[in-house]
């Protein structure tokens, strides 16, 4: 059991110097204003502004700036700097928090009607701990990763305690009859623009210090048990947010706890069980609501919340194929397009010089099947002075070029990634080599000289990849794609030796198409672009491929699985399912396991089958448009009966994928499986009382 009150507000020796509310407010505003400059690509301005102050808010701001750079680029040196700054911020905030609690009765200190004295500094500690935890988990050291989880736990407890203060405030306001002060106001496009708040009636300050001293959080407590009615959802112009310290605490607690709940809800099944054992419980819906609430505020935290929402929606949601059906009027788990577009437009207006928000605009276009526009946005002359943002821009450009089969640009861009970022150089070389392999195959029969040059480059980049694999680690483990790349190239080298052919002729199914599949590029493609992928896949069985007759069931299964994925994206579900049944499920799974084998085929096929079943549902078709053809054309009366069967079968395949023994890329595929199972459970809950 954790005594939150004694930890958060325990009595410690404190300085006799009190914290003046005016100087505290000035420090907060100065620090947040300076730190926000990094989101407009003004790194020097942010660093210079923050160097002028020594307050806990300035220390936190310096930590935030380093943290943003660290998480955008994963560079070890920047992560070390971030860790040092965040440790300093945590220590400073702890001292100020104890001082604020000790001097809480001084006449010149700020007294909030919502939060106990010193809560703003408790939040600073939690933010520093949360960011330190992320840096620790990203670190290559297992020891640092474990320390990161310890910090995460401390931040989790603090944030939960702060949010319980808000719940207590809401309850007291209701009990005293002042319902207007906690009335939920109409939500705008994620930023509260244009809405007017009901003036808050005076509410007596709540003595939460005593309440918190008796509050315990056990390791198995579910902090996410409260619903939307227990959350403050007021807009920034509400009377309860007259003081910027309260704005900072409210927006900060919502952002930090929201991102925690969201991230924990996304982790793969095996890992989520471990997190549950040590007291972490995710809640995607509540987490997203909290992020949207934080994004309303015109400060650094509001912008970070907006970046998180856009990143989740244009990245994770579009990466996953099975997501909850949108809820009319207040959808947060799906893809609320108008709301997201309004949020992005506001951020672009606030930060016109930033390449970061341009990157998000590109991602949004890609997520909405406008890959040409997405690529064009990233091919401009402007460069970010922030190396980490520039690396992200080039990486995103590389992926878009890959989806569009722009092989020359794809290869050039991934080679540029090698220079800009050291995170996964083996993968960058592998995809660059794969792009040149595609160029080689395209012209081998018409221009032997040019084809030979592309073959030479393909071999050069393929052989550069394995020595770089394993250089970077996540929680002391090799990155999933590093393992994949090393095995693939070893497999091709072994085949080249066995078949006595050049390396480029020992490669099987188009590795670019395989990569498009793993990055879920098909969901971003138009019908015409999907047809191009089908054409590229057809090369394997063409006369141009002299080694196809030597291929075994493994490579042929990969070809059919990739074809099935393209067919699903085309909404040709019957064909996709039949292809999976006859080409993969009819095979003994032992044929796909063993040395140098692609052991991911079977579990991924189960996920693909589940995705087809989910997308065939009458509800899905009503929202997204019907499939190109279907052998099952139900009447309205049988829609629900059919949908129940489809969801049941979908869940069966997902559970098989979730329980599959360890395989290559299981962590990556596991993210999709976790999201899918959650979507299915939400559907089951919504339809539990509906007769079928």
Curated annotation (Swiss-Prot):
Species of origin: Aspergillus niger (strain ATCC MYA-4892 / CBS 513.88 / FGSC A1513)
Biased composition (Polar residues): 175-184
Subunit architecture: Interacts with lipid droplet proteins.
Function comment: Inclusion body (IB) resident protein that interacts strongly with lipid droplet (LD) proteins. Involved in LD-mediated IB clearing after protein folding stress, probably by enabling access to the IBs of an LD-stored soluble sterol derivative that acts as a chaperone in inclusion clearing.
Name listed for the protein in its UniProt record: Inclusion body clearance protein iml2
Pfam families according to UniProt: Iml2-TPR_39 (PF10300)
Region (Disordered): 87-111, 175-202
UniProt GO cellular component terms: cytosol; mitochondrial outer membrane; nucleus
InterPro entries assigned to the protein according to its UniProt record, in alphabetical order: Iml2/TPR_39
UniProt keywords, alphabetically: Cytoplasm, Nucleus, Phosphoprotein
Family of the protein in this entry: Belongs to the IML2 family.
Lineage: Eukaryota, Fungi, Dikarya, Ascomycota, Pezizomycotina
Gene it is expressed from: iml2
Subcellular localization(s) per the UniProt record: Cytoplasm; Nucleus
The keyword Metal-binding belongs to this UniProt entry's keyword annotation: no
